[in-house]
Structures are given as C-alpha cells and as structure tokens.
Amino acid sequence: MSYKCISLDEARMLLDNPDTVIVDIRDSQSYEDGNIPESINISNNNIDQFLEKTDRDVNLLVYCYVGNSSKGASEYFVQNGFKTVFSLDGGYEEYALN
C-alpha cells in the first residue's frame, strides 16, 4: 500500500467528498494565515490524538507548503494503517494561487 501524489484538479474532487479528511502539516501560524477549508492542522503535538480517533478507511488528503513534506507525511500515514492517502502536488501554495 502506498500514497498517491495528485494535482489540485484531482484534489478538488476529494474536497467535495464528505469521506475525505484534509490534513495540513504546515506550522500553526501558516495554518492560521490561510488553509484549505475543513482541514485539520497536524503537528507533533496532536498526531497521536489524530491517529487514535481517525478511521483508517477515510480518504486522507495531506498538504504542506509546496508538496514536498507532504510526501513523507503521507508515507507515515500509510505506515499507520491509512488505506487511501493522497499528497497534494504544489501544496497550499498551489491551492492559494487557484
């Protein structure tokens, strides 16, 4: 099982799906300054709680600043049992431009 890197256009279909959990792995200040609606800001401080309470069968869309760190985070989520994990190419920067 592995994650898939997807474009913003592909991600938009997931954003409309109620079974999608959106994870923002940027720092909390960047998250506060702007984020994808309905996203959850995940850090080392709350990752354990997120793993405990989140169903492994959801669609998990992970994003960061420009799409690099989200790949490592996506792999981490796969290793922790999530079945359908996506990393947003271009990250929040791409989302904010469009």
Regions found by a protein language model. Name each.
Residues 1-20, 27-59, 65-98:
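Rhodanese-like catalytic fold shared by cysteine-dependent sulfurtransferases
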